[in-house]
């Protein structure tokens, strides 16, 4: 990182460059040198007039002909591309007639009383149950929701928001700009589709947004008589089940996915929490279906204890040198040992072969090198309380509870000298792609989807529709500024921030990592620029909402890692209502929340003391005595009514939310809090409105990007924070040829340019450079799209198997009688034994009945009456013998069932269910491990001109058939061998009770699983 500039440099000069310095400029491959006096306005104005753009022979007329492409150079191609020709007008025309139908109903609906409005919900439900299509109900349903929103929230959805709702109802992706009210749009189709009674899931990216949306816009469907549920991380299964049964349920993508996997690991019907899927609305759909698509959802169980090998490997990795002992491929995120690396590692470890399967040193050493080179602290992860926490590269948030697999997380822990946690083994997994494709009707909304429309259509069959904005978007996206080295880039970023800050404009600076945001923060501190930092560090995460709420204030400077899913709009002048809520929250929460409540769950240490204190600088003014007294009285009445420190944080937040919204209030305490909130908000608004005028006059919010992301879409998300709802604004990206994206994916062209330029801190402008940078970003997009597509194709193989296994498991879990399933297992197992020991093509005279009988009786001792003569008489043909053995297998099961039921009525049913579920879970877990190894192995077969995917399908299918057969065999064998044992309670318990103990069946809790570990190794006799 470069040294910061002194104040005079910031004010008067380009970073470290004299106004008369020579420039080296590249134009279409030609390096030019020019000496010309530069004015600071031309450098930092709307275009860099000093750089040279050449046409043919420098002809001005030729240059004008090419000006469209050349003027967009400096990498500023983004703004040209993404303003796009489609501004949503075609969508407006497409839905104009339906919007008109909704508007015609407005007068009629607005004349209804509250109770009459609720009755419309019942009438619409009845029409839906009679089979009337949702499309025919849409105009009235949307009109009802619009009116309810006016009454409850004080917000009337615009026509463009109705269009957004119609797009979502149609099962498409609605691209809506930031600030256009996506949260409100979601309740329109959610209400309509909930009328069927089958449930609707509204999916958001984090718990905070799910709770906010449920508490805020969820009031509208609640007002109309629908039940609205919310799923949060720490809820019990009972709470989850209750909330999933609501008409509309707000939930995060990870909670929903993990609940699905947990349901498929449940051992009783009571543990199931989900209902059948019906309709799903995904907020920030690109974040969930594209950014998160590379990371499958995994539920894992503990494996063996961690090994000391991790620490030894970490020491070796730290001693080894790059390009001497190992090479790194940053694009593929892989490392390889060189010949010297192999030899030195084997010598240090005193082993003959690094790849000896008994020691597996190679995987430990390679993971340690990956941890050293590719997984960087404050970029890929942070450390909190001696734990390595992964940072989401797309949102900048900590991914609580997530761990890297295959020993990589342990390698990072060893690198940092932290305690190594247990390794894990996969119990259940699914990709977001295949999970959400289970919904019969799926839709989503985001501010940036059109650039990924091909992926949405090819994988999810979802069309992207651009919804028009309510007011024209007037944000100005400036051309990018490109430097050779990062030093020049960071100097220019500081100058840009300083210049904008002095005009009073609000500035939002986007960085790609925690490390970058901290380094830039240090530069700004040394330059004397007051600012806020929003990244994954815990001290910043806790203040996220308040930081974003003040990001639009006069002269505010905010540094933030990726802004996707932040959920709080940046309002110019500051968000008065949000500030008022924070002030009321600051007073209320410490007095009503239980001191032990919180999300911290640890047996090692007590939870940290919770505080709701807000930095006083956040508020636009000190609260007047009158308003402070009003707030104190309202809080005191709440304490008296609810009790001193008697609520959970979630309950208190919910009541505070009701107090700060515009819906009807019956509760006296909520009414007092509402009055206090409105009074505080009004006082703050007087100041924020004045600030807003000044910020707008100065030019609005200015967004500074410091690096291109792996997708143009994420760049657009950052730009989209400015210019909301017709506000003025601007954006500009500052790039360096040393940025990761260009260094890793740029190829020879960009490397050549880096060698050609000798000045680090002059901006470069060239059509060729722009093309090269844009091509590098396109390469990244295509590369990661290919990864997601490959993951999807491979997971589809697993998905069909997963569906079959989970269907079989659910059948065993919910069936009242498992007899038909067990009979099916018995018959198929007899078929397997017969085929393995005789076979349909074996001549009759070669049939070995002794061998067959031995194997049958090994499985079922109840068939000890079988003799070769009996089989000869019963089975004159292979088919006849098959039918006879099937019948005997079936009869043996029924006989065993009768024996057990006589001993303990109802026990057999519990035993059967337990045996089926435990065998499915155990063998499915082993199957997942086997498929993982197969997937790794087939990758190398491409060198032999064999398609890895086809190889994976074939091998995976064979493994799956064998697993399903093994489940059947294990279950029926265990049932045939099952012997209930009556056991006594502990003598200690007897002495405590002072009474003799009763005899109880060992299966009153879980039946003993006899034979699962000692079943015959095969169905064929030796």
Curated annotation (Swiss-Prot):
One of its GO terms (biological process) is protein import. It holds the Pfam family SecA_SW. Induction: Up-regulated when light-grown seedlings are shifted to the dark. Keywords: Acetylation, ATP-binding, Chloroplast, Membrane, Nucleotide-binding, Plastid, Protein transport, Thylakoid, Transit peptide, Translocase, Translocation, Transport. Residues 985-1022 are annotated as: Disordered. Its EC number is 7.4.2.4. This is Protein translocase subunit SECA1, chloroplastic. The lineage of its organism: Eukaryota, Viridiplantae, Streptophyta, Embryophyta, Tracheophyta.
């Amino acid at each position: 990182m470069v040294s910061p500039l002194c104040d005079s440099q910031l004010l008067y000069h380009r970073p470290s460059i004299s106004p008369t310095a020579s420039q080296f400029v590249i134009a279409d491959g030609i390096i030019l040198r020019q000496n010309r006096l530069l004015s600071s306005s031309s450098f930092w104005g709307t275009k860099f007039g000093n750089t040279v753009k050449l046409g043919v022979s420098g002809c001005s007329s030729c240059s004008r002909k090419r000006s469209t492409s050349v003027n967009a150079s400096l990498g500023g191609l983004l703004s040209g591309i993404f303003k796009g020709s489609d501004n949503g007008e075609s969508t407006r025309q497409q839905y104009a007639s339906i919007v008109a139908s909704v508007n015609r109903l407005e007068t009629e609906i607005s004349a209804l009383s509250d109770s009459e409005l609720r009755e419309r919900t019942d009438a619409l439900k009845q029409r839906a149950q009679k089979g009337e299509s949702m499309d025919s109900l849409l105009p009235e349903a949307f009109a009802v929701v619009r009116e309810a929103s006016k009454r409850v929230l004080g917000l009337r959805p615009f026509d463009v928001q109705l269009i957004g709702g119609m797009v979502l109802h149609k099962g498409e992706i609605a691209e809506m700009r930031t600030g256009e009210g996506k949260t409100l749009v979601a309740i329109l189709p959610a209400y309509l589709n909930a009328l069927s009674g089958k449930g609707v899931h509204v999916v958001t990216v984090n718990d905070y947004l799910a709770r906010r949306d449920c508490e805020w816009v969820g009031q509208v469907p609640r007002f109309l008589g629908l039940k609205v549920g919310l799923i949060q991380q720490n809820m019990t299964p009972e709470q989850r089940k209750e909330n999933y049964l609501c008409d509309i349920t707000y939930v995060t993508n990870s909670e929903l996915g993990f609940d699905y996997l947990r349901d498929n690991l449940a051992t009783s019907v009571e543990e199931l929490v989900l209902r059948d899927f019906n309709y799903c609305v995904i907020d920030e759909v690109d974040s969930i279906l594209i950014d998160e698509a590379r990371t499958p959802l995994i539920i894992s169980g503990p494996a063996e204890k961690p090994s000391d090998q991790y620490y030894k490997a970490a020491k070796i990795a730290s001693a080894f040198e790059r390009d001497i002992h190992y090479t790194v491929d940053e694009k593929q995120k892989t490392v390889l040992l060189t010949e010297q690396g192999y030899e030195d590692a084997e010598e240090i470890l005193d082993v003959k072969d690094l790849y000896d399967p008994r020691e597996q040193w190679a995987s430990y050493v390679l993971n340690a090198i990956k941890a050293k080179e590719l997984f960087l602290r404050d970029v890929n992860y942070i450390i909190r309380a001696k734990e390595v926490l992964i940072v989401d590269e797309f949102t900048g948030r900590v991914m609580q509870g997530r761990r890297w697999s295959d020993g990589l997380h342990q390698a990072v822990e060893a690198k940092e000298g932290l305690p190594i946690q247990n390794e894990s083994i996969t119990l259940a997994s699914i990709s977001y792609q295949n999970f959400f494709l289970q919904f019969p009707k799926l839709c989503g909304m985001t501010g940036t989807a059109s650039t990924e429309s091909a992926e949405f259509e090819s994988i999810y069959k979802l069309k992207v529709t651009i919804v028009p904005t309510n007011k024209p978007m007037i944000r100005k996206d400036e051309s990018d500024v490109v430097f050779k080295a990062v030093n020049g880039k960071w100097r220019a970023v500081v100058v840009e921030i300083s210049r904008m800050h002095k005009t009073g404009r609000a500035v939002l600076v986007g960085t790609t990592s925690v490390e970058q945001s901290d380094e830039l923060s240090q530069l700004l501190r040394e330059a004397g620029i007051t600012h806020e930092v929003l990244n994954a560090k815990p001290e910043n995460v806790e203040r996220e909402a308040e930081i974003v709420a003040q990001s639009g204030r006069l002269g505010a400077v905010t540094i933030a890692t990726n802004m996707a899913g932040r959920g709080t709009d940046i309002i110019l002048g500051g968000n008065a209502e949000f500030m008022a809520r924070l002030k009321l929250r600051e007073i209320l929460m410490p007095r009503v929340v239980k001191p032990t409540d919180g999300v911290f769950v640890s047996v090692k240490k007590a939870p940290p003391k919770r505080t709701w204190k807000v930095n006083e600088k956040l508020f636009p003014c000190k609260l007047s005595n009158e308003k402070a007294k009003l707030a104190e009285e309202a809080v005191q009445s709440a304490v008296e009514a609810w009790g001193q420190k008697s609520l959970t944080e979630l309950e208190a937040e919910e009541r505070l939310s009701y107090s700060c919204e515009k819906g009807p209030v019956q509760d006296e305490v909520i009414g007092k809090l509402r009055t206090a909130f409105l009074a505080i908000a009004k006082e703050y608004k007087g100041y924020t409105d004045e600030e807003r005028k000044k910020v707008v006059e100065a030019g609005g919010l200015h967004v500074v990007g410091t690096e291109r992301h792996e997708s143009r879409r994420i760049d657009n998300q950052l730009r989209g924070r400015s210019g909301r709802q017709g506000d003025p604004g601007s954006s500009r990206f500052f790039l360096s040829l040393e940025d990761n994206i260009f260094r890793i994916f740029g190829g020879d062209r960009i490397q050549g340019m880096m060698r050609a330029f000798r000045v680090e801190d002059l901006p470069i402008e060239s059509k060729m450079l722009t093309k090269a940078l844009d091509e590098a970003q396109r390469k990244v997009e295509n590369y990661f799209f290919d990864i997601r597509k490959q993951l999807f194709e491979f997971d589809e193989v697993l998905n069909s198997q997963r569906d079959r296994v989970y269907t079989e498991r659910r059948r065993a879990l919910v069936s009242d009688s498992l007899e038909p399933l067990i009979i099916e297992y018995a018959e198929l197992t007899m078929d397997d034994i017969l085929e393995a020991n005789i076979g349909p093509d074996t001549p009759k005279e070669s049939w070995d009945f002794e061998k067959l009988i031995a194997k049958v009786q090994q499985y079922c001792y109840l068939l000890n009456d079988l003799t070769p003569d009996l089989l000869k008489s019963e089975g004159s043909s292979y088919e006849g013998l098959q039918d006879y053995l099937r019948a005997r297998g079936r009869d043996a099961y029924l006989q065993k069932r009768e024996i057990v039921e006589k001993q303990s009525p109802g026990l057999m049913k519990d035993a059967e269910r337990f045996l089926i579920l435990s065998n499915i879970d155990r063998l499915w877990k082993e199957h997942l491990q086997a498929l993982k190894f197969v997937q790794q192995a087939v990758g190398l077969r491409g060198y032999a001109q064999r398609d890895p995917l086809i190889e994976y399908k074939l091998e995976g299918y064979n493994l799956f058939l064998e697993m399903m057969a093994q489940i059947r065999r294990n279950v029926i064998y265990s049932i045939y061998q099952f012997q209930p044992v009556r056991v006594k309670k502990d003598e200690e318990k007897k002495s405590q009770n002072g009474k003799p103990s009763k005899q109880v069946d060992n299966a009153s809790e879980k039946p003993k699983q006899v034979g699962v570990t000692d079943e015959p190794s095969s169905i064929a006799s030796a």
